[in-house]
């Protein structure tokens, strides 16, 4: 029995050494786990700090983009006001153009009326000239059918008439104040006055028509220039508005993306905490 006790006493130190070794391993393992967890916590703290900084920067960017969006909306409102003013000005110009067109149509109608009157007078003159010519022809035909005696009597009467007229003319020539010379001079003077009046009227109307043509041509060119200029302004304004609207849509999309990113970052921060 004493031998057994000695053997048992010799076996206890080995078991104690094994327990001590396993305990030390466990302690070392726990220490390593704690160290690893502490290192992981430090990393997570750094990540959390960086995420908070990024979130702060994103909030700053969102605020800046929001301010820029408001400024863009203000510019769009100003552009809309400018477009509205331009439309009003174009409406005013169109009213003026319609008024000028009405005046032009009226003048054209007056010119056409004057042309029609002139043509009517020419038709009447041609008809009168044709009648005179026909009368002369018919008179010639009748005269060609007269007999010799009839022609002789008529020629004698005509010669007598010519002699009488010759005597009257001789008397009128000897008397400067004679009725026939005075009448002829008055007729000549009246004809000259009428010719001068007609010439002056023709010159005046011609000058007036030329001035009207020049005025109409000038107005037409000015209207074309104004139309081209305002068309260019409207096109430029439409391009600017389209560009601003495109930028606005892009900024809204960027804000949405930033808000999504911020929401994801907040979610990550909440999970880390």
UniProtKB/Swiss-Prot annotation:
Coiled coil: 24-116, 179-269
Alphabetized UniProt keyword annotations: Coiled coil
Keyword Transmembrane: no
Basic and acidic residues bias: start-end ranges: 1-17
Disordered: annotated segments: 1-39
Domain of life of the native organism: Eukaryota
Protein name as it appears in the record: Coiled-coil domain-containing protein 122
Organism: Homo sapiens
């Amino acid at each position: 029995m004493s031998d057994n006790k000695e053997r048992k006493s010799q076996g206890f130190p080995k078991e104690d050494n094994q327990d001590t070794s396993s305990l030390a391993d466990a302690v070392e393992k726990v220490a390593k786990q704690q160290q690893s967890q502490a290192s992981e916590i430090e990393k997570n703290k750094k990540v959390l700090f960086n995420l908070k900084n990024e979130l702060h920067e994103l909030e700053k960017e969102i605020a800046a983009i929001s301010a820029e969006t408001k400024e863009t909306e203000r510019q769009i409102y100003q552009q809309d006001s400018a477009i509205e003013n331009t439309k009003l000005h174009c409406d005013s110009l169109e009213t003026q153009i319609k008024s000028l067109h009405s005046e032009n149509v009226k003048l054209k109608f007056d010119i056409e009326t004057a042309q029609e009157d002139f043509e009517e007078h020419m038709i009447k003159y041609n008809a009168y000239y044709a009648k005179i010519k026909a009368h002369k022809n018919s008179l010639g035909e009748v005269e060609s059918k007269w007999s010799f005696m009839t022609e002789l009597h008529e020629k004698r009467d005509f010669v007598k008439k010519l002699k009488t007229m010759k005597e009257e003319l001789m008397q009128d020539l000897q008397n400067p104040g004679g009725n026939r010379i005075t009448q002829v001079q008055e007729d000549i003077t009246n004809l000259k006055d009428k010719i001068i009046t007609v010439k002056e009227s023709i010159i005046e109307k011609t000058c007036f028509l030329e001035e009207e043509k020049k005025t109409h041509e000038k107005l037409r060119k000015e209207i074309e220039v104004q139309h081209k200029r305002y068309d260019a302004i409207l096109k430029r304004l439409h391009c600017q508005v389209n560009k601003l609207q495109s930028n606005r849509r892009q900024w809204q999309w960027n804000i949405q993306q930033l808000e999504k990113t911020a929401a994801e970052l907040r979610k990550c921060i909440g999970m880390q905490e």
